[in-house]
A protein has these predicted regions:
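Interhelical loop/hinge segments that connect adjacent transmembrane helices in multipass membrane
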Residues: 1-4, 116, 176-182, 192-235, ...
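Membrane-interface junctions at transmembrane-helix termini in multi-pass inner-membrane proteins
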Residues: 5, 130-156, 339-370, 410-412
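Helix-loop junctions and terminal segments of transmembrane helices
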Residues: 57-72, 143, 257-299, 352-357
Length: 483
């Protein structure tokens, strides 16, 4: 875990820096510099692109991580890398042709509701294509155990560029329409930068020769395409369906709550960059003992780190909403439901890496397809009835079923589970800390209240976590940097 913790810590710092910039954009710059309708438009375009890009990538970013270490010669590795580069291009061209022929249908789809979206529909394809290749080249760097630069580009670069663009809009240098086009170009430039970095780590010899186990690779890519897309679909489906049932500004309002809750997932995202290829390597070498140890320790470490973030969000949410325009404020219940989803995700440790790099990914595929349909039905029923609260409830139910399914699959097939008695103690402590501080408000400015409450909660949490040794890996990291 030493290398994992070291790179994960660097990635977590980078990711939180990016999320800090994103928080300023999401909570303040977008809400004050753009009209609600255009903020909702931006949120919709990015959510729709997130639904599309996994299909363009055709799962090859996961395929690369799984199969790369199984090849022993440079020639075979180069054949795999060439396939990884060409396959998404072919799929994207096919999807582009379908998009061209169905463009008039898409325009008619938006006639009945949010017509503001119509001129920008084609940008979804460009953003999705750029994101697909960015993820492929990011995986390229991860198989070389270099994830820090890619993580910076994934979490910081585009948010920093958006900050600059928003200020250009504020100072009337850019119109809102050109801002949206410029934002699209940011994603294209990010993909190009990631490609140059990946090639600097390892540039294959280009050939049209195909890897020897082509059928296995293609079958895995096709299946993992759906299985690996489930989390993305479950995450962004609600926002896309909100746009269909409610005025588009509701996408922005709901998106703020989603972004706040997503901060909890930062430790998991940071650790995943390095733990994913390592898990694949352990599975390829059949090292079950190390795999089991990694499963438990990653779960406990992620829970310890993400739990304090969960507490800070919930106890400060009312004060935080006082800092943004009234029209963007929503029920605390929505943030709580979405935050619980993210906390549960962290508790699973490296379960996704175990499943997607094992021979049991077909089972995940089956559950994923079923749960995507269930999530669609949940949103179909709950959004018209409860509005954005219904979207949050649908996401909570869908992710709860999905995560429990993954836990049961790993328990059944690998005879291991990530939880210990410490997991229960941490959850009880977190629940008590949250309830104790949620109703305690200081009579000061919201920023001062947030700072005071955050300091008190953090100090109490760190003292208890270190005293009772919630996670040995976290304790070692704290001692190292404390010195």
């Amino acid at each position: 875990m030493g290398v994992i913790i070291k790179q994960s810590f660097k990635n977590m710092i980078t990711t939180y820096f990016g999320f800090g910039i994103g928080a300023v954009n999401t909570l303040f710059l977008f809400t004050y510099f753009l009209e609600k309708e255009y903020y909702g438009l931006v949120s919709f375009l990015l959510s729709a692109a997130n639904l599309v890009w996994p299909f363009m990538a055709f799962g090859v970013h996961n395929t690369l991580v799984k199969f790369y270490t199984s090849y022993k010669t440079k020639e075979e590795k180069d054949k795999l890398l060439n396939l990884i580069l060409l396959l998404p291009l072919g799929v994207s061209i096919l999807m582009g042709m379908i998009g061209v022929y169905s463009y008039s249908w898409l325009l008619n789809y938006f006639d009945a509701g949010n017509e503001l979206v119509k001129p920008y529909i084609w940008l979804i394809f460009i953003i999705a294509f750029a994101t697909a290749y960015f993820e492929i080249f990011f995986a390229w760097s991860k198989i070389n155990y270099q994830s820090v630069f890619g993580n910076f580009m994934k979490e910081v670069f585009h948010r920093l560029c958006v900050t600059i663009l928003l200020f250009l809009v504020y100072f009337s240098v850019l119109s809102v329409e050109y801002f949206i086009y410029a934002m699209m170009m940011v994603f294209v430039l990010r993909a190009i930068a990631m490609q140059l970095y990946a090639f600097s780590l390892y540039k294959p010899s280009f050939t049209l020769a195909l890897p020897t186990n082509l059928n296995t690779v293609l079958k895995y890519s096709a299946l993992i395409l759906i299985a690996g897309s489930v989390a993305t679909i479950l995450l962004d489906l609600d926002k896309v369906m909100i746009e269909h049932y409610l005025p588009i500004e509701n996408v922005a309002i709901y998106g703020i709550a989603v972004y706040i809750a997503t901060v909890i997932s930062v430790p998991q995202k940071a650790m995943h960059q390095i733990i994913h290829p390592l898990t694949a390597s352990l599975l390829n070498s059949s090292d079950k003992s190390s795999l089991k140890d990694l499963y438990k320790r990653s779960s406990l470490t992620l829970l310890v780190v993400s739990a304090i973030i969960f507490v800070l969000i919930i106890v400060n949410i009312n004060e935080l909403y006082k800092l943004i325009p009234v029209e963007y404020q929503i029920s605390t219940t929505i943030v709580l439901l979405l935050s619980l989803v993210k906390l549960f995700d962290n508790m699973l440790g490296n379960v996704n890496s175990v499943l997607f790099n094992s021979d049991y990914y077909r089972i995940v595929l089956l559950f994923g397809v079923v749960l995507s349909i269930v999530a669609f039905v949940f949103n179909l029923i709950l959004i018209p009835k409860f509005g954005i609260l219904g979207a949050a409830l649908a996401s909570f139910l869908a992710f709860a079923v999905y995560n429990i399914s993954k836990l049961l699959i790993v328990l059944n097939k690998f005879k291991m589970q990530p939880f210990t008695l410490d997991t229960f103690y941490i959850l009880m402590f977190v629940a008590g800390l949250t309830v104790s501080f949620y109703f305690w408000e200081f009579p000061f400015h919201p920023i001062i209240n947030i700072a005071l409450k955050s300091i008190l909660v953090t100090v109490i949490y760190i003292v208890v976590a270190l005293r009772f040794n919630f996670s040995e890996d976290v304790n070692q990291l704290v001692r190292k940097y404390w010195k």
